[in-house]
């Protein structure tokens, strides 16, 4: 939503992986940057219909993935939880739901195929920090960094070729 743009930007720029400064400097700088960038960002969001499509699309992707996993792997129940890095739902918002589900193992899968300390690295770190803060210990692995995975490339190639044929 438009009213969430500035707090989203603040969360983004207050991340030590984005601005590697002591908190005493990073916090006011994040406030300044988010305040100055918010008007331009709000105009962009207005052009997108008033909000970012990312959460809606991520929910759809999550639901489709859970259905496919549960159809393919019938010996276990799979559930996908969405955690956003700079806006809701944050790791702190989701951990109770994960604990209630009580998985034997958690597989973290950032939607960024490439590794970057400021994106996938920061997201993984936040999840681990929240687990530690909540004294939550469960086997956790990460699917990270798959930009050259052949299946990933094939899926993108297939969609690109479809678009080219539509031109």
Predicted region positions:
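Active-site-proximal alpha-helix that buttresses catalytic centers in soluble enzyme cores
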Residues: 1-167
């Amino acid at each position: 939503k438009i009213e969430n743009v500035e707090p989203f930007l603040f969360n983004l720029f207050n991340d030590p992986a984005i601005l590697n400064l002591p908190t005493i400097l990073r916090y006011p700088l994040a406030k300044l940057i988010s305040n100055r960038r918010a008007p331009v960002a709000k105009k962009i969001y207005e052009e997108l219909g008033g909000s970012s499509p990312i959460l809606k699309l991520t929910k759809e992707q999550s639901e489709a993935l859970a259905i496919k996993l549960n159809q393919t792997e019938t010996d276990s129940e799979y559930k996908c939880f969405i955690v956003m890095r700079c806006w809701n739902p944050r790791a702190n918002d989701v951990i109770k739901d994960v604990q209630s589900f009580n998985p034997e193992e958690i597989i973290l899968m950032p939607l960024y195929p490439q590794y970057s300390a400021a994106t996938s690295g920061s997201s993984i770190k936040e999840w681990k920090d929240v687990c530690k803060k909540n004294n939550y210990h469960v086997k956790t692995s990460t699917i990270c960094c798959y930009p050259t995975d052949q299946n990933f490339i094939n899926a993108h190639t297939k969609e690109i070729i479809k678009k080219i044929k539509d031109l």
